[in-house]
Every structure is written in C-alpha cells, then in structure tokens.
C-alpha cells in the first residue's frame, strides 16, 4: 500500500462513492476530523481528488468529494487502487488465478478491459453463485470464440461462469443505467485498470 492506511481508506471511499459528504466520509473512514481534513487537503493539493462546496452566505454548508479522473495524478492513483483490489481478490480466491491467467493469455487484443461483477465482486458469493465477467471491446471480436475460450480456461472451476460482452461505446452510453450502475459501484478489474479509468473519466 503506497498511502497511509487512513488516506487509502479515504481514497477508496471517495472513489466508490463519488460526491460523498465530509461528514459521511469521516464516519465511514473512522478517522478524526483533524486527520480527515489533513488527508483531504493533501489529496486536493495533489489534484488526486476534487471537491464541490455548497455555500450558505459566506459559510460552507456542504463539502462533496470526487475522484479527480481528469488529472494524470488521479488516473494513476485510482488505477493503483484498482490493482490493489485485484490483488486482494486473488488472495481470497486463489483457485481463480490460473483460469484468469490462461484466459488473458488467449483473448483477442481488441478486448480493452475485463471486470468481475456481481456477488464475487462484493465477496457475497455462495457455492451456487455464478462468476460474472464483463468484457469490454473496442473493435469487432469473435464473441463465440471468446465464450469457448472462457469455457476452456475455467474448465477446472466448479461454478458457473457467465460472460457478458459489451462494446466500449455501448458501455459508455448506458453507464448510468441499471446493471451498469451496479458494475461501476462494485467490480474487480482483471485487465485494463487504466483503460477503465479513462472510460469513466467523463462521468466523474
């Protein structure tokens, strides 16, 4: 972890809850007001996060914090957070390391990002849960071939694997709707963290 524990928690909360209020951030991060303000000022001055203030007269009534995905610093930091999430996922699901390694080795290079979503992403899976995988592509790919590769790669995995294949453009168009909102909120990026950050950049 490249940040102090309290700062990392603040970053994670802002990334997963864009627009989070200062009071909620302090409560969920379990830090003092002084610590939170110190960490936030550092992250703001580094252009890693951004804020919006609501004023009442000359007083600041509400402070909302967002990941700053328009800055290089923000992109790099939040892609590292995605990488950390992936490492934590594989520490808890060692039986998926091999299948994903084989899958990534053999899939079309037109696939820019691979994400886990659903119960496995929230660590709420049971023995009956499907492993939901989203593939985002930028150019035409052979979807049937991809599904066969998924079957081959996960042949030793004892649970159902449910691949979902989307074009990057379609994902962007629907990013604020239904299942897409859920995927944005809870996911593990297996491939293409920086590409994914760039995808959602215009929605920060």
Segments predicted by a language model, with ranges:
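Short helix-loop-helix/strand-helix junction enriched in hydrophobic and basic residues
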Residues: 112-120
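Acidic Asp/Glu-based divalent-cation binding sites
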Residues: 130-132
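Catalytic core of pol beta-like nucleotidyltransferases
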Residues: 1-110, 122-128, 138-204
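Short hydrophobic/aromatic beta-strand micro-patches
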Residues: 134-136
């Amino acid at each position: 972890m490249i940040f102090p524990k309290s700062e990392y928690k603040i970053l994670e909360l802002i990334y997963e809850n864009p627009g989070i209020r200062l009071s909620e951030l302090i409560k969920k991060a379990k830090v003092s007001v002084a610590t939170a303000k110190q960490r936030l000022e550092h992250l703001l001055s580094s252009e890693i996060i951004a804020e919006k203030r609501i004023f009442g007269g000359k007083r600041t009534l509400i402070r909302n914090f967002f990941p700053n995905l328009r800055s290089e610093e923000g992109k790099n930091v939040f892609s590292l957070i995605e990488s950390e999430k992936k490492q934590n996922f594989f520490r808890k699901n060692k039986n998926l390391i091999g299948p994903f390694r084989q899958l990534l080795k053999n899939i079309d290079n037109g696939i820019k990002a691979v994400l886990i979503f659903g119960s496995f992403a929230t660590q709420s899976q049971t023995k009956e849960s499907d492993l939901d995988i989203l593939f985002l592509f930028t150019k035409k790919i052979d979807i049937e071939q991809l599904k066969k590769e998924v079957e081959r790669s996960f042949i030793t995995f004892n649970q159902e694997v449910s691949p979902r294949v989307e074009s990057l453009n379609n994902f962007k168009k629907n990013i604020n709707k239904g299942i897409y909102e859920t995927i944005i909120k809870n996911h593990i990026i297996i491939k293409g963290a920086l590409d994914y950050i760039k995808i959602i950049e215009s929605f920060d």
